[in-house]
């Protein structure tokens, strides 16, 4: 195959080759090449390292081309799958599909958490820029910002009615915000000795739980703002706390590679779950609707009969997702496929699927019954840090280090 280079391009290439040979000590080859290519003894400065630069940029371009080809294949598949069919999918089978409905910008640093409001068509994003933003997920409009934290906001949570919002931050505080009228901070709680990484309401709404890098979990009374309990046991940074819908138990995960399930009313750890091989970043309780799919998936692996649950999913820096029966402390299944840390998990309200967000920049949809990844969305330009699935409307939201919040429609 004949290369079509202009005279000037040929001369520049020869100079770059001469520089490469000279700088890597190929003196004899350089001498021969100079004679044959009719080059002067001095190579111009601008050709220094040029050959290596061109080589690495070609490799980068090839990688980009492969990524774009994968996205194109995905989009073509989407057109076929998204087209009207005789067998209409029921809402219980709807999953997020590209492209995103909205890509929302405004935060000036990484997004740390995204959550839906339990009642209104609103969602909330927390960011390392120390602010919380409120958006309308149906229109994509920005509503307002909540300002008060002085460092990265790590997590946000609503009470069951969506009247109160709790937030926690690397500034060591937990704040409660009036989400009905004033949108002002009504309480600030201090007590942790390090970064507060996660926050969650107990379902009745009278208590808030917080998890921290100081290795403890604390329970706070909403009415007074007092710390009423401290749970200890994790050996390293506690990354996330999530309360079971019944409120009698809650789960935490940690850099110590374990998940602990605690009794809310005492300080006792009910069970410690160990199987992950790296920091456990995120956890999510499975809805009751997921029990049959999880049992069917687990049935192939063990013959111990029906699992009662409750079931908990965990995502780790070991790139896997595990699903546990916490009543017996058993890992029932492992989902592998992400190429980087798993940072966020959310169950489909219909119970058939689990969605995950990862540092590999994708969102994956997992078919629980068949223990397989059934869809990969190339979601963000940088790490995906958080994901939420709406309980009643066909929407998924995701947040990323690329400073965007994305809204995905399910169909």
From Swiss-Prot:
Tissues in which the protein is found: Expressed primarily in germline cells during oogenesis. Low levels are detected in the germarium in regions 1 and 2 and in both nurse cells and the oocyte in stage 2-4 egg chambers. Enriched in the oocyte during stages 5-7 and in nurse cells in stage 8-10 egg chambers. Ubiquitously distributed in early embryos. Expressed throughout cell bodies, dendrites and axons of the mushroom-body neurons.
Comment, domains: Dimerization mediated by the LisH domain may be required to activate dynein.
Family, similarity comment: Belongs to the WD repeat LIS1/nudF family.
UniProt feature coiled coil, ranges: 56-83
Keywords, sorted A to Z: Cell cycle, Cell division, Centromere, Chromosome, Coiled coil, Cytoplasm, Cytoskeleton, Developmental protein, Differentiation, Kinetochore, Microtubule, Mitosis, Neurogenesis, Oogenesis, Repeat, Transport, WD repeat
Cell compartments where the protein resides: Cytoplasm, Cytoskeleton; Cytoplasm, Cytoskeleton, Microtubule organizing center, Centrosome; Cytoplasm, Cytoskeleton, Spindle pole; Chromosome, Centromere, Kinetochore
Domain LisH: 9-41
Entries under InterPro entries matching the protein: Dynein_regulator_LIS1, G-protein_beta_WD-40_rep, LIS1_N, LisH, PAC1-like_LisH-like_dom, WD40/YVTN_repeat-like_dom_sf, WD40_repeat_CS, WD40_repeat_dom_sf
Gene Ontology MF terms: dynein complex binding; microtubule plus-end binding
Protein name as it appears in the record: Lissencephaly-1 homolog
Effect of residue 128 to K: In Lis1-23F2; induces lethality in second instar larvae
Function: Positively regulates the activity of the minus-end directed microtubule motor protein dynein. May enhance dynein-mediated microtubule sliding by targeting dynein to the microtubule plus end. Required for several dynein- and microtubule-dependent processes such as nuclear migration during cell division, mitotic spindle formation and the removal of mitotic checkpoint proteins from kinetochores at the metaphase to anaphase transition.
Positions of WD repeats: 106-147, 148-187, 191-230, 233-272, 275-334, 337-376, 379-411
Taxonomy, superkingdom: Eukaryota
Cellular component, GO annotation: axon; axon cytoplasm; cell cortex; centrosome; cytoplasmic microtubule; dendrite; dynactin complex; dynein complex
Primary location group: cytoplasm
Pfam families hit by this protein: LisH_PAC1, WD40
Species of the source: Drosophila melanogaster
Residues in the signal sequence: none
